[in-house]
Amino acid sequence: MLFRSTTMYEYGHVKEFNIRSWRAFDASPLVDAETDTLIWPGENGLLYTIKLNTSYDKAAGTLSINPDKPVFTRYMTDLNTDPKNDLGMENSPIIVENYLYVGDNRGTYFCVDLNTMELIWAQEIKDDQNATAVFEWGEDGQGYLYLGTSMEHSDGSCYMYKLNAVTGEIVWETEWTDIVYNKNVSGGVLSTPLLGKKGTNFEGMIFFHVAKSPSEYEGVLMALDTDTGEVIWQKNMKYCWSSPVAVYNEEGKGYMIICDSVGNMHLIDGKTGGILDTVGLGSNIEASPVVFNNMIVVGTRGQKVYGIKIS
């Protein structure tokens, strides 16, 4: 328990069924409150579901769980039949209604029906995916996914996509070349893209950051057109893993906050890519910032948490 710093529950590694031996979790789990079920993709290639049997007494201030034995499965398709493939899942899943969306290390993005655990579709995206995708309901009532790949297996390129969430079909693909390969720290899209909010001046734009391009310690921030995938603007900066966030004023004018690997927090005009202000926080910022009202909060590799006020 948090207030006692004791372990409430622990589950061991599955050795016989997993596709990959690596037993870590990079993805963040999701909990379905209605069914009291935790859903968690693993780097060993297994998708876990765990009934938590949660008991919460608000008046007494008590919380307990008594998890059932985890139920897990794995997925193989014609796109990833090579036994040498590292079919782990490092990006966090998206769940919309009863459908889960997630990608694996070898360039497959797929959709699972959580009611049946059936694989609905799988789409090749050419490389590893570390960053969580973004879901959008389109003006046509259709669901769409925006996602990007890291540069782990491809030759100097990463890819940004818009997918049809029902069929998995590619609406557009934008390739970004000139990425430096580093076997210890991959380049490409390593942060979740930022989708512009409807009814604001960011509408129709999706913002990606590509790390290690055009050199080892640089990156490129760019805005793409959500309909076509065409680059609206691009800006060179230090590379980052931190995901950008947006803040909007009452008139619907948007501003972007993005943090980089040398400790800078930038306030950016999302329509042009121009830097409006920069605050130095002293060390690498790998975490993504959160915004509450006019306060930005973020942690750094320097073991400090900062609150930055927007004025």
Can you describe what each PLM-predicted range is?
Residues 44-47, 108, 150-155, 200, ...:
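Short glycine/acidic-enriched loop and turn motifs that connect beta-strands
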Residues 34-36, 97-98, 142-143, 203-204, ...:
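Short coil/turn segments that connect the beta-strands within blades of beta-propeller domains
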Residues 1-2:
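Short, small-residue-biased leader/transition segments that mark boundaries at the very start
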Residues 40, 102, 147, 207-208, ...:
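Residue position within the beta-strands of beta-propeller blades
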Residues 8-31, 60-95, 122-141, 148-153, ...:
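Extracytoplasmic beta-rich repeat domains
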Residues 5-9, 52-55, 113-117, 164-167, ...:
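Short loop/turn segments that connect beta-strands within beta-propeller blades
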Residues 280-311:
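Blade-level signature of beta-propeller repeat domains, shared across WD40, Kelch, NHL, RCC1
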